[in-house]
């Protein structure tokens, strides 16, 4: 029994940094993310699109065939698991965010340790990093794909930097996992694979320029592709079994590339530059940390030139991949994966401050003071996050105040109700009412998908759903025959700084 207790104690001691990062993640997301149990619900339309798809899979729906959406299938497989724990609350979503953000903080801390060693500075770095990212504009409502995938990039950076510092090639395990992560990124949101293109270019330069070992390079490429293909095989098998490979390529690739509305004739590279600059200007703190990180790596370039090259290539790849398509505010969050280098630079400056020699007994007091200061920094950062987060206003509302739950009370008076979220992205009404869409275009998307409007119009004109929900514009303002429906309820709620009115229409008896 004692041996088992000692073994558990040793395991906890070894994993103290990971446990700390998960704790910090849970604490900051409790405040900064609307998926937190402190909020009535996460009312972000993107999150609800993912949840509706995940819940649809649990009910036998096939993405892109039975339910249309724009992101990649791996995201929906993940959200099918989330939906199992998300039936009555957002605990499943919150847990997903805590784990993925906690892993990001952990691998960011491991990057910091490459430069600072086992320094106590790593602990406040984690807290400050969580506070900076959690309160940035790009964090949005919490629960974005970009937020969920931050740990993929942090792990990739950690692997290549650690291998460089140890003067060795990437191990089989490191390469395979990065290949799996690249496959996940590709089948979640393929623009994020720009990071891995940058990493691949760095590995090529590193193996041929420094290691001078093309055999290891070929092995590394093979292991990486093995991981990537493992994820891709699972995706293909699922859609092959369901006879939906064509729909997968049409919806996920063709529609996203060619059907997004654009009237901008600016050259593509200039457009990427403009979007990147806008993201760095709009978000305040993490771009500053990135600039500081670049300055730090430039100072270190003589001793660690590969670190700067790895940073630049991975960062450039991610920027180009992210902004070659669109430039929504939350897209910039992926760049915060590089923020830790700025905090490492600041910690390095602080370590240059030398205290005078003090007696051994006094050293214990100094250590206690340092730990107290670290705890103070962590608590102050948490309090500051509450003050700066754009989301905390929603804590003042109860579930009953939300239009989603108000409408759900009426919707659930009908046996096996069907609803259509019309004219805007998924507002959370499927989630609140516990319904699964019967219309493939269960909401109105930003991409002008073929048949989207026609299908939704047909469902309304033919009375194929029990309820229709619109936002801002009543059904009467659309050019369609809505005579089979009557307005039964309306409710208002602020969303992203705008007071929206929602309208609930019910099929006439």
Residue ranges and their predicted role:
Residues 194, 318-320, 324-362:
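Hydrophobic/aromatic-rich transmembrane helices and adjacent perimembrane loops
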Residues 172-192, 196-202, 230, 315-323:
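Membrane-interface alpha helices of multi-pass inner-membrane proteins
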Residues 387-388, 393-448, 456-477, 495-497:
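Short periplasmic/luminal acceptor-recognition loop of GT-C membrane glycosyltransferases, typified by
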């Amino acid at each position: 029994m004692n041996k088992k207790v000692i073994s558990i104690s040793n395991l906890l001691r070894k994993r103290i940094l990971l446990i700390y990062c998960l704790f910090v993640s849970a604490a900051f997301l409790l405040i900064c993310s609307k998926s937190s149990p402190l909020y009535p619900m996460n009312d972000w339309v993107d999150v609800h699109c993912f949840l509706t798809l995940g819940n649809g899979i649990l009910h036998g729906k096939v993405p892109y065939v039975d339910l249309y959406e724009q992101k990649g299938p791996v995201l929906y497989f993940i959200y099918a698991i989330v939906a199992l724990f998300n039936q009555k609350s957002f605990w499943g979503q919150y847990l997903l965010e805590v784990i993925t953000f906690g892993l990001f903080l952990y691998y960011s801390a491991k990057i910091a340790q490459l430069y600072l060693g086992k320094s106590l500075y790593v602990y406040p770095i984690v807290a400050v990093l969580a506070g900076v990212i959690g309160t940035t504009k790009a964090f949005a409502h919490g629960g974005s794909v970009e937020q969920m995938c931050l740990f993929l990039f942090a792990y990739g950076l950690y692997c290549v930097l650690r291998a460089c510092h140890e003067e060795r090639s990437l191990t089989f395990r490191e390469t395979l996992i990065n290949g799996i992560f690249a496959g996940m990124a590709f089948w979640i949101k393929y623009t994020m694979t720009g990071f891995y293109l940058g990493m691949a270019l760095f590995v090529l330069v590193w193996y041929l320029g420094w290691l001078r070992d093309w055999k290891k390079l070929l092995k590394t490429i093979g292991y990486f592709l093995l991981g990537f293909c493992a994820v891709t095989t699972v995706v293909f098998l699922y859609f092959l079994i369901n006879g939906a490979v064509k729909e997968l390529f049409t919806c996920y690739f063709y529609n996203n590339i060619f059907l997004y509305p654009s009237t901008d004739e600016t050259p593509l590279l200039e457009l990427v530059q403009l979007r990147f600059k806008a993201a760095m200007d709009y978000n305040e703190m993490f771009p500053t940390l990135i600039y500081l990180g670049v300055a730090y790596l430039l100072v270190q370039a003589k001793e660690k030139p590969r670190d700067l090259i790895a940073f630049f290539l991975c960062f450039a790849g991610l920027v180009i991949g992210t902004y070659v398509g669109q430039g929504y505010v939350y897209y910039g969050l992926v760049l915060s994966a590089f923020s830790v280098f700025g905090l490492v630079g600041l910690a390095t400056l602080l370590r240059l401050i030398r205290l005078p020699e003090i007696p051994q007994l006094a050293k214990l007091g100094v250590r206690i003071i340092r730990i107290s200061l670290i705890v103070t920094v962590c608590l102050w950062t948490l309090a500051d996050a509450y003050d700066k987060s754009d989301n905390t206003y929603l804590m003042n509302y109860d579930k009953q105040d939300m239009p989603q739950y108000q409408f759900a009370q009426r919707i659930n008076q009908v046996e096996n109700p069907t609803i259509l979220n019309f004219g805007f992205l998924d507002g959370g009404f499927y989630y609140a009412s516990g319904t699964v869409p019967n219309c493939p275009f269960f909401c109105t998307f930003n991409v002008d998908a073929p048949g989207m409007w026609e299908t939704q119009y047909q469902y309304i004109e033919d009375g194929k759903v029990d309820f229709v929900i619109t936002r801002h514009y009543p059904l009467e303002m659309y050019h369609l025959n809505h005579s089979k429906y009557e307005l039964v309820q309306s409710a208002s709620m602020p969303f992203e700084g705008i007071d929206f009115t929602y309208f609930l229409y019910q099929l006439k008896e």
